[in-house]
Design a protein with these regions (language model features):
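Loop/turn elements at helix/coil->beta-strand transitions in domains of secreted/extracellular proteins
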Residues: 38-42, 73-76, 107-111
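Sec-dependent N-terminal signal peptides
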Residues: 4-13
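Non-catalytic, surface beta->alpha helical segment in thiol-disulfide oxidoreductase systems
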Residues: 97-138
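Thiol-based oxidoreductase modules, predominantly thioredoxin-like and allied folds used
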Residues: 22-26, 62-86
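Conserved redox-active cysteine motifs that mediate thiol-disulfide chemistry
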Residues: 46-62
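Short pre-active-site segment immediately N-terminal to redox-active cysteine/selenocysteine motifs
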Residues: 39-42, 46-50, 98
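Sec/Tat signal peptide C-region and signal peptidase I cleavage site
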Residues: 15-19
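A short beta-strand-turn-helix
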Residues: 23-41, 71
């Protein structure tokens, strides 16, 4: 009986994890190559482990199945800690000092838009969609 409960809990946990946003931790060049191959845009999450709004987004937004599905269809997503070299460089280049900061790029590396700060899932997806829609008009 204990084995059955363990297997069921494991299966439920695996199902829940499938809906989450899958973030790459590879180099920015590798992420861009993945986006080119898949025909998707690049989404970058600049965060810090000590940042409460960053942790809230991870817990309440990026863990949701609807957000995960939305992001998976449109992006190769990556996340970089702003306390580490890649995150510091991206923050220096594209940020204004406040995190979380979300950057959306096309496959040529052109910045299409940025979202700064935490938001509720619906507002987050609307902000992302607005950037995507704006990029289609270019």
């Amino acid at each position: 009986m204990k084995k059955l409960i363990f297997v069921l809990l494991l299966a439920l946990g695996a199902g829940a994890a499938q809906g989450q946003v899958k973030f790459e931790t590879k180099s920015t060049d590798a992420v861009r190559e993945m986006a080119i191959k898949s025909g998707k845009l690049v989404f970058i999450d600049l965060y810090a482990s000590w940042c409460p709004p960053c942790r809230m987004m991870e817990r309440e937004v990026f863990s949701r199945k609807d957000v995960g599905d939305f992001m998976q269809q449109r992006f190769v997503a990556a996340k970089y800690n702003t306390d580490k070299p890649t995150g510091k460089e991206l923050m220096k280049r594209y940020g204004s000092g406040a995190i979380p900061l979300y950057l959306i790029f096309d496959t040529q590396g052109e910045l299409l838009g940025r979202i700064q700060g935490a938001s509720a899932p619906k507002e987050f997806m609307e902000s992302v969609q607005k950037i995507i829609d704006g990029s289609k008009r270019r």
